[in-house]
Amino acid sequence: MPKQIHEIKDFLLTARRKDAKSVKIKKNKDNVKFKVRCSRYLYTLVITDKEKADKLKQSLPPGLAVKELK
């Protein structure tokens, strides 16, 4: 079941949870979507700024499996 997160802070807190399994990064021409899989929901954060997306990618937790999609 999907849920959308609108704040970067909330997304980082969700990514640090112990039930967070993996992060998928989908890049389109106008935005970047970060999808974090937790036990119950798939949380999505949509960012339109490419620089913010790069910074967020750097600040993801190191133990999380990160997969980049086209």
From Swiss-Prot:
The answer to keyword 4Fe-4S applying to this record is no
Q: Name one Pfam family in it.
A: Ribosomal_L38e
Q: Does the keyword Ribonucleoprotein apply?
A: yes
This protein's gene is called RPL38
Give the protein name, as stated in the record: Large ribosomal subunit protein eL38
Q: Which family does it belong to?
A: Belongs to the eukaryotic ribosomal protein eL38 family.
The record's Gene3D superfamilies line, in alphabetical order, gives: 3.30.720.90
One of the record's GO cellular component terms: cytosolic large ribosomal subunit
Which domain of life does the UniProt lineage start with?
Eukaryota
